A protein has these predicted regions:
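Core catalytic region of metal-dependent phosphoesterases/phosphodiesterases
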Residues: 1-95
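Conserved catalytic scaffold of divalent metal-dependent phosphoesterases
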Residues: 67-176
Length: 176
């Protein structure tokens, strides 16, 4: 977080970005919350949130155990930090706040949305493997994700028709 991520934050601020997205695996392995690396990461995310809204996507569970990212919205900052820990959509609103969909997607484009993000955090392949077998898990995940993504077509089309950009975010492994 000190050098690489810090440089990225410096560049985002210097270039005047409107928002920042971190698509998972903020660290290369799981860290204890009291570790110095988590403190550095938190300071950099806070510095970024002082500049623009921040969206963080849940990464690989071995790097970011579930719940790890929950501390980041609590850091404060001029702008909010939203953590997408589940499949769903979130809109960046005109006032710079985040508005998450109540379900897995929006039913209508939120009034005042600047952009709509479809968030696909990491999929627990072990759970899928337990249901379909290890040999078939990767293909099963692919089929389910394809079906899921097609379910977003309607709302994304409505957003584009309203000239609201749509952005797909994912964290995972591509097979095939």
């Amino acid at each position: 977080a000190g050098r690489c991520f810090g440089y990225g934050v410096d560049q985002a601020i210097e270039r005047g970005v409107d928002l920042a997205v971190i698509t998972g695996d903020s660290t290369d392995h799981a860290l204890d919350v009291h570790s110095p690396a988590v403190g550095r990461l938190a300071r950099e995310v806070r510095r970024l949130a002082d500049h623009c809204p921040v969206l963080m996507l849940q990464g690989t569970f071995s790097h970011e155990p579930p719940g790890t990212l929950a501390i980041f919205p609590l850091l404060g900052g001029r702008h909010p930090v939203h953590v997408a820990g589940r499949i769903g959509q979130v809109a960046l609103m005109a006032d710079g706040t985040w508005a998450p969909a109540q379900g897995w997607r929006f039913d209508a484009v939120p009034a005042g949305a600047r952009a709509v993000f479809t968030c696909i955090p990491t999929v627990n392949k072990a759970t899928v493997a337990a249901m379909v077998g290890a040999a078939d898990a990767a293909e099963a995940v692919g089929r389910e994700l394809a079906a899921l993504l097609s379910g977003y077509a309607g709302i994304n089309g409505a957003a584009r028709a309203a000239q609201v950009p749509t952005i797909g975010l994912g964290h995972g492994t591509v097979t095939g």
